[in-house]
């Protein structure tokens, strides 16, 4: 099968970007021919699948096709431009280039099916080709739909003409039905898979990994967070929880926060205000560094106010790290008391208590083993690809 995949973001730095890259790799490895269209603002390394990056203007861009940085629903490590900031001309230019490149690549690549990421502009571009297409709803597109009505005609037209719509969690599925009025028999929940070759239990030196991050003192415990530094990610709640667990626990606890975003400076000021001496902002980390981070952590946290799915939680579990998250969005679909804990949103006291409970458990080794096995058995890309292939076939016949 020849599959053309379109996304709104680069193949790194966002959940949908990582999803798109992994999807393209996995489909290629089992014999499909794949090409991916995606925005970029710098050169990209070769992959095993074909690519057509659309070059946007970044901080260091020289050759670009469109004179502003690629827009996001929230933020991206390489762009703080949002869809909501685009003026009428920029919005028109964005839609035009997405449609034009999709039509050009459909003509050249001649795909059997198109897989659009997000119910936003890419499904609209896909329907312009007249080819069958499916779309995956990642959750941030739902935020965008609620926030900016200018995009409604495009998002709705693309959604309503899709042969099938994939949703990534129960909550995302419910909201997709409410906002886009897509029939039940067109929607299918397919949980995201993770890269089993990359995210796994490793025998690493805590001392060496910390030194790579510029931290020389080895603590008794490590708490990790990985994600965008945006309001919906709830990092401010984690910092307030850190104030509590640092005070209550006699042993030294280090909190490592990986990621960039619009709230970086604001969160650093909050850390200083709370006088957190053992909390470190690592900035953007690559996938290999993320694996190391999870492997040295005792607990990984996802304190989000809303989390469409929570791939970072799956990746942490795959590395044998229990996860403490919030009971909103996609996290309740898979976090249970055998591998972690769920707490109420914006409850720093409950978050701190859940983290402390994980740290003092007598069965931590068994719990880490369970976390890894749970991720492998339930969220491998092998399982995800089987579901996606089935949806492609349903959409074609």
Residue ranges with predicted function:
Residues 36-101:
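A conserved catalytic-core segment of Leloir-type glycosyltransferases
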Residues 171, 193:
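Carbohydrate-associated surface elements
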Residues 216-233, 239-242:
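Conserved donor-binding/catalytic core segment of Leloir-type glycosyltransferases
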Residues 265-285:
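Nucleotide-activated donor-binding/catalytic signature segment of Leloir-type glycosyltransferases, i.e.
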Residues 284-285, 292-297:
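Short alpha-helical donor nucleotide-sugar binding micro-motif in glycosyltransferases
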Residues 305:
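Aromatic "clamp/platform" in nucleotide-sugar-dependent glycosyltransferases that forms part
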Residues 322-325:
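Short hydrophobic beta-strand element within catalytic cores of glycosyltransferases
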Residues 337, 341-348, 357-362:
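Conserved acidic donor-binding segment of nucleotide-sugar-dependent glycosyltransferases
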């Amino acid at each position: 099968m020849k599959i053309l995949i379109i996304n709104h973001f680069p193949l790194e730095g966002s959940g949908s970007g990582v999803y798109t890259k992994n999807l393209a790799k996995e489909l290629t490895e089992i014999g499909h021919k794949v090409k991916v269209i995606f925005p970029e603002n710098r050169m990209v390394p070769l992959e095993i699948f074909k690519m057509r990056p659309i070059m946007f203007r970044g901080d260091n861009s020289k050759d670009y096709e469109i004179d502003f940085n690629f827009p996001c629903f929230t933020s991206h490590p390489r762009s703080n431009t949002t869809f909501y900031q685009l003026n009428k001309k920029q919005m028109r230019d964005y839609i035009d280039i997405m449609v034009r490149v999709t039509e050009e690549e459909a003509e050249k690549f001649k795909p059997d099916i198109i897989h659009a990421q997000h119910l936003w502009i890419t499904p609209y571009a896909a329907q312009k080709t007249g080819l069958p297409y499916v779309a995956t709803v990642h959750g941030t597109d739902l935020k965008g739909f609620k926030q900016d009505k200018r995009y409604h005609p495009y998002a709705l037209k693309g959604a309503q003409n899709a042969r099938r719509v994939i949703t990534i969690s129960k909550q995302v599925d419910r909201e997709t039905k409410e906002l886009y009025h897509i029939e039940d028999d067109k929607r299918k929940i397919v949980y995201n898979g993770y890269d089993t070759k990359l995210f796994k239990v490793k025998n690493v030196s805590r001392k060496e990994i910390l030194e790579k991050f510029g931290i020389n003192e080895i603590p008794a415990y490590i708490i990790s967070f990985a994600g965008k530094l945006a309001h919906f990610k709830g990092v401010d709640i984690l910092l307030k929880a850190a104030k509590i667990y640092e005070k209550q626990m006699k042993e030294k606890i280090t909190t490592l926060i990986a990621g960039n975003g619009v709230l970086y400076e604001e969160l650093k000021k909050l850390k200083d205000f709370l006088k957190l001496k053992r909390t470190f902002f690592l900035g953007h980390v690559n996938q290999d560094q993320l694996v190391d981070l999870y492997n040295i952590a005792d607990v990984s946290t996802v304190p989000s106010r809303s989390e469409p799915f929570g791939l970072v939680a799956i990746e942490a579990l795959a590395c044998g790290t229990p996860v403490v998250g919030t009971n909103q969005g996609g996290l309740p679909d898979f976090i249970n008391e055998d591998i972690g804990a769920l707490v109420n949103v914006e409850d720093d006291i409950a978050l701190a208590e859940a983290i402390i409970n994980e740290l003092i458990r007598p069965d931590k080794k068994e719990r880490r083993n369970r976390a890894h096995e749970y991720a492998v058995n339930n969220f491998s890309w092998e399982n995800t690809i089987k579901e996606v292939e089935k949806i492609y076939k349903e959409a074609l016949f």
